[in-house]
Structures are given as C-alpha cells and as structure tokens.
Amino acid sequence: MAEVNVRNFNINFGPQHPAAHGVLRMVLELDGEVVERVDPHIGLLHRGTEKLMETKTYLQAGPYLDRLDYVAPMNQEHAFVLAVEKLLGVEVPKRGQLIRVLFSEIGRLLNHLLNVTTQAMDVGALTPPLWGFEQREKLMIFYERACGARLHANYFRPGGVHQDLPEVLIEDIGNFIDPFLVALGNLDALITPNRIFKQRNVDIGVVSIDEAWARGFSGVMIRGAGVPWDLRKSQPYECYDEMEFDIPVGKNSDCYDRYLIRMEEMRQSAKIMRQCVDRLLSTEKDGPVSSLDRKIVPPKRSEMKNSMEALIHHFKLYTEGFHTPPGEVYVAVEAPKGEFGVYLVSDGTNKPYRVKLRAPGFAHLQAMDFLTRGHMLADATAILGSIDIVFGEVDR
C-alpha cells in the first residue's frame, strides 16, 4: 500500500489581514487547500458599549450608536431613537420623518458602495474602490453639511432630528442622484460582467432558505436566498409605507447574488431619496423637524432668550435628562447590513436599565464556518467580503 502524506494545516487569518475587514482573527483548519473548519475569534474590538449606555442619560447614549457600524452611522441611531420614542409615545413631525428616511438611505449608499467595491478588491480588482470612494466622499459632505460631522453624526435625536436642513442642501442632494446613477452604471459595467469576478463569486458560499432562517440571517443575506424580507416593507416605520420602491431578491444565494442585490438596492435607495427630496421641497417645505414637547426636545435658542420656562426645560434636559415610563421595548430597523435591533428596558429613571443591541453582522459572522466548509482557502476571503462585516457592531 502506497504511503500518502496528508497535509493538514492550521493557519491564522488576521487579525491584521487587509481582507479581514477590521480586527477579525479566523483560525482555519485546512486539508491541503480545502477548508475543513473556520473558527472566528471575535471580541478584539469589544468596548462594552451596552454597559456604557446604561450609565448615560438617553440623550448622552445616542453617540455610542454611531460607533457601532461606523460605515453608516445614522442607521444605527435610527433604531435607538425609535425605541426611545416608542417608550415615550412621541410622534415625529412629517418633515422630520422625511429627513430621517433621506439620511438612512444615504447611509445605505455609503455602506453598499464600501462593501461592493471592497468585495471586488478582496478578489483582486483595484479600480472599483477608487471609483466608489469618489461617490462616498460626496455623500460624506452631505452628512457634514447636515450636522457638522462626517462620521459620528449624532443627528437623529429622540423626537426628531437635531436641526433642519437648508433648502440649498436638499437641492444639492437632489442634483447628486442622476450623476450618481451614471457612476453606478459605470461601476456595474466594470464589475458585473467581469470573468474573473464571476469565477471567484458564482456558486461560492451558497445557503438555502431554511438554513438562512435558522441562522438568524437578515438583510441582504436573507434576500439573497430568495426571501423578499425587508423591514421597510414588512414592518414599515417612519414614512416608508408612503415610498415607492422594490425589494431585489436573489435566485442562487451565492456571493455573486449578494453583490447584485446590493447594486440594485443602491438604485432603489436613490429612488427613495428622490421622493424624499421632492416632498421636502414641495408639500413638506415648512414645519417642525422635531417634536414640540419641550420636556423631550430642547427649545430653540431664540425661545430661551425671552422665556423662563424654555430656559428651565433646556437646563433640565442637559443636566438630568428626560425620564421614560417603565417598560420594555424592542425596535428593529432595516440597516444596510440587515436587521439592527435595539431592546430597551426602562425602570422609569433618566437612564436605560438595560440596552441590548442586536447587530446583524454578529449573526452573519457565526455562519462563516458553515458557509466556508468544503471551499478553497481563497474562497474564504470572497465569502467574508460578501457577508459585509464591520467590527464595531460585531464586538460592540
């Protein structure tokens, strides 16, 4: 009987690997070049966000949400402020809702541009990130013009948004959409028909519908399996039920499908943005952008100069903060990476008793072993790129 040398390797992927999307360490067990087991070691970016939020007032806890999925910060803020508003029973004025939806969709573009182009870079294409980041830069400037910050915005507040948008900014966002769609078409023509990109992504990381549900997938990962599950349609929040848009779904549930869905989602986001811009410039041109309940939303500076009550409200809000009625609430939004949920438990004080953040990337990373098993080592990077992971939210 001939002697066969079986070469079993254990290798470390990361935590400083350029394709690891942050501080991910994966211990891979290989048989030759075939992956037999993947063990993701997470927690290298753990900052104790949930516990920190429990020591702060509701207003002070807001900025922590920006630091989770820092690619699309306002989408995480959205879930938190909706949860606080649900506890308080506060209604956000229509103009405030439209501004929130507009910036949530800008966040979706920011996220998908980064993911699609870096997914291409992970398999060897170097041009897409340069093209994609040019568009991201323009969107970052919209963030900056709305609230002064490019990344950690803290723009969504309980009761509405921090400040109104100037009309010229809304017009500029409207003028951005058509050139963006042209640029997206160029990116599409560059990557989608590319032979090498297809060979690296088609039939890689396939997952069935039942497996996807069982593993807690959401967002693009579940839609890739052919399920039209999108919280903006199935459990509408804000004014998404008044918007016209389609939900792209996949057929083969592989990495290539997930890429195609993200590309189409960007077009749908642009469609939603256009509807928001049109309404903000016509029917909802005037009106408040946040609730007028001064016990929750701080009064305007001009009001404080001649009203003692306004001054008192302002002082109380920024020292003690508002109290929420006791109870518990779970609110989920369709973040770019999937279902981002915030579970709040209130004990009637000015601070949350317990905050639980449900990060979509956390559930998706746990499936890495299942998705990669039996594939080649080089496919692990393609699969990791397609599940869209940011470590701020995975490790929290």
From Swiss-Prot:
It comes from the Bacteria. InterPro entries: NADH_Q_OxRdtase_suD, NADH_UbQ_OxRdtase_49kDa_CS, NDH1_su_D/H, NiFe-Hase_large. It is found in: Cell inner membrane. PROSITE patterns: COMPLEX1_49K. Keywords: Cell inner membrane, Cell membrane, Membrane, NAD, Quinone, Translocase, Transport, Ubiquinone. The keyword Nucleotide-binding does not apply. NDH-1 is composed of 14 different subunits. Subunits NuoB, C, D, E, F, and G constitute the peripheral sector of the complex. Belongs to the complex I 49 kDa subunit family. NDH-1 shuttles electrons from NADH, via FMN and iron-sulfur (Fe-S) centers, to quinones in the respiratory chain. The immediate electron acceptor for the enzyme in this species is believed to be ubiquinone. Couples the redox reaction to proton translocation (for every two electrons transferred, four hydrogen ions are translocated across the cytoplasmic membrane), and thus conserves the redox energy in a proton gradient. This is NADH-quinone oxidoreductase subunit D. It comes from Bartonella bacilliformis (strain ATCC 35685 / KC583 / Herrer 020/F12,63).
